[in-house]
UniProtKB/Swiss-Prot annotation:
Transmembrane feature ranges: none
Name the record gives this protein: UPF0354 protein BPUM_2629
Family of the protein in this entry: Belongs to the UPF0354 family.
NCBIfam families linked: PRK13668.1
Length: 270
């Protein structure tokens, strides 16, 4: 299969995202494609290289997924102003990388907390097939505090269904949390899950959240386990629609420490 260029991908997405009310802008220097609603001025900016990497593995599925994501997001943006009061059960925390924007496309500061050296915690209002990140304007309008958002989201993430698959590779066990509800990585914030697995871990407990739709807990019982976890993390990171970090974390006594996975060696903390 020939490698797709950013321009080719942009053209393919344009052909699938045809709407008289939408404009498309391809930025060759930044390798991005922006799809914007002409009436609202709001839109989505797609970073093309990660999509190409995923397309090389799953061509049709990747394009279908991106098109669906853009349509749902633009539809949500065009809808009526979202309210959080009365929708407390629809508020969840979402993990993003520290490079994720701190403000919306309108320049309104998003509500977030620092988490680790690699990650931040943002807060989302679930809208069914999509969600909206909560911003400072929404809090002020409804007289909510950041603490209230944090507590509500923390409570809700503990109520999410847990779907786990375990694989054993070279004497190491890997637990994959994939409920495919958009909040798999958020389960990292459920302390009861971490404590439960900390009790059953026989070796070193390591954690990975390469993108928003996967959360991995590893029971590393020998040095090859670190290499395997590193390879898994990089693979998932490259294929995720919303990548977070390719680095893993050591979990010890309730604390997360980002680590480098070095080939054929034990991890080194940053």
């Amino acid at each position: 299969m020939a490698k797709m260029t950013s321009r080719q991908l942009a053209n393919e997405l344009k052909s699938r995202l045809t709407n008289d009310n939408w404009s498309h802008q391809f930025d060759r220097e930044k390798d991005t494609l922006r799809i914007e609603d002409k009436q609202t001025g709001k839109g989505i900016t797609l970073e093309l290289p990660p999509i190409i990497a995923k397309w090389e593995v799953k061509p049709d599925e990747t394009l279908d997924e991106i098109v669906y994501y853009v349509k749902e997001a633009l539809s949500a943006m065009k809808g009526e102003a979202q309210h959080i009061s009365g929708k407390e059960k629809q508020i969840y925390p979402v993990i993003r990388s520290t490079s994720f924007p701190e403000a919306s496309s309108d320049g309104i500061p998003l509500v977030f907390d620092e988490h680790t050296a690699e990650t931040r915690i943002y807060y989302a209002l679930d809208l069914g097939s999509t969600y909206r990140l909560i911003d400072e304007k929404m809090l002020q309008k409804e007289n909510w505090t950041k603490e209230r958002i944090r507590e509500t989201a923390s409570f809700n993430v503990r109520s999410l269904e847990t779907v786990v698959k375990m694989d054993e590779v070279a004497g190491n066990r890997f637990y994959f949390f994939r409920a495919n509800d958009g909040y798999d990585a958020s389960r990292l914030l459920n302390e009861s899950i971490l404590q439960e697995y900390a009790q059953k871990i026989e070796g070193q407990m390591a954690i990975s959240v390469p993108h928003q739709d996967v959360f991995i807990i590893a029971d590393v019982c020998n040095e090859s386990g670190y290499d395997i976890l590193g390879q898994m993390s990089m693979s998932f990171f490259a294929s995720g629609t919303v990548p977070i970090t390719a680095l893993s974390f050591l979990y010890d006594e309730g604390k997360l420490e980002p680590i480098f996975i070095l080939a054929k060696s034990r991890p080194k903390q940053q």
